[in-house]
């Protein structure tokens, strides 16, 4: 079984409609709510309700803010690793690293046929909706530059941590909803849901 995880109603409804139209089988769709605890607890509860070897892959689908210049609303990011941007456990842990856990969590994206529609990069997760250039730059300054953070969200690393502990392959696919590095962030976010979301999520759904 493949488990698809979303956070918000808007994301959930778009994915649910597409799965029904495509008559996709052996797939479960979850909506956990926004944030790290909601994401981790929602996925953990589901995994506890099924036989351990039934789930072969977890795919998180949702939105993220861009963390690099040039990314536009509607662009699609495939996470190649996941980290927290709001965690500090002291030395010798890296910034963003939960003690006893990897500094970054791995991604299983080998099943995706990569092309020019998608960009690989690290997705940084924290319990904050990031809206300004200053916030993005502070996050990137806090984390090691080698992470190549290109998007910021509120769920991916928490889901990746659950999958890491369970030994389940995990992939996060994020559609860029806005770029806080640009002054038009507020308008971008509103315009994304009005004009671009359905088209962008259709691209993502065809991967599933």
Predicted regions: what they are:
Residues 1-3:
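Extreme N-terminal starter segment of soluble prokaryotic enzymes
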Residues 5-8, 12:
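Gly/serine-rich nucleotide phosphate-binding loop at the start of the catalytic core
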Residues 13, 17-208:
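Glycine-rich phosphate- or other oxyanion-binding loops that anchor nucleotides, phosphorylated ligands
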């Amino acid at each position: 079984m493949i488990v698809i995880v979303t956070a918000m109603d808007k994301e959930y409804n778009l994915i649910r409609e597409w799965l029904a139209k495509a008559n996709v089988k052996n797939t479960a769709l979850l909506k956990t709510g926004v944030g790290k605890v909601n994401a981790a607890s929602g996925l953990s509860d589901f995994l506890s309700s099924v036989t351990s070897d039934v789930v072969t892959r977890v795919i998180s689908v949702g939105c993220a803010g861009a963390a690099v210049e040039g990314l536009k609303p509607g662009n699609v990011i495939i996470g190649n690793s996941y980290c927290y941007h709001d965690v500090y456990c002291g030395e010798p842990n890296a910034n963003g690293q939960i003690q006893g856990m990897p500094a970054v969590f791995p991604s299983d994206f080998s099943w995706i046929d990569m092309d020019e529609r998608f960009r690989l990069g690290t997705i940084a997760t924290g319990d904050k909706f990031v809206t300004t250039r200053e916030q993005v730059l502070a996050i990137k300054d806090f984390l090691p530059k080698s992470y190549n953070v290109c998007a910021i969200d509120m769920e991916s690393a928490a889901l990746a941590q659950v999958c890491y502990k369970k030994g389940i392959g995990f992939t996060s696919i994020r559609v860029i909803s806005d770029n806080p590095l640009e002054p038009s962030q507020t308008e971008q976010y509103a315009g994304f849901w009005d004009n671009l979301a359905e088209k962008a999520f259709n691209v993502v759904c065809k991967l599933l």
